[in-house]
């Protein structure tokens, strides 16, 4: 099996294989080009995003700069996905992001890992595991999602959290390692930051 065929199998492989590196260089040049498109050219930005990423739903926006190992080629975006500055996609294998999900500044989604054994690691070997993030999630600033993690729908991940295990739907989760803090519920329909009251009209206004 060729090394590039192991990108999506979870097997240990050699990422510096010439075929992989050649394609990766082309894709990373596209990221560099995207990062230099002026904000006053939104149509060009959207067009290039669709060229780079595996899938892009309607009304997606990624602030610049962003970074992607494979240029976003293995990233699947639903509709209305927003990413703030400094998004890092270690997209050596697939990353799936659901409709309406938002990322704060400097979020990292890392699908790649390396063997713990120092001999194997010194050879530059790695493996990749996919990341799945559900619909209507909010990942706060500086969140890191590790290889193989699945995050359910309607989840809030607190800023600075490191997500090493799956997170179920409908919860607030925080910490290092990230753990479920509580359920998202009726209280959140009435109150926001430090129990400030929400105007009920907001649900109909926007």
Q: Model-found features: residue ranges?
A:
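Terminal amphipathic alpha-helical/low-complexity segments used for targeting or macromolecular assembly
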Residues: 1-59, 178-206
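Short arginine-rich
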Residues: 33-35, 166-170
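Flexible, glycine/small-residue-enriched loop-and-beta-strand segment within the central core
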Residues: 43, 65-151, 176-177, 182-193
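Short-chain dehydrogenase/reductase
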Residues: 138, 156, 172-174
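Conserved catalytic segment of ABC-fold P-loop ATPases
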Residues: 152-155, 168-170
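C-terminal/domain-terminus segments
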Residues: 154-163
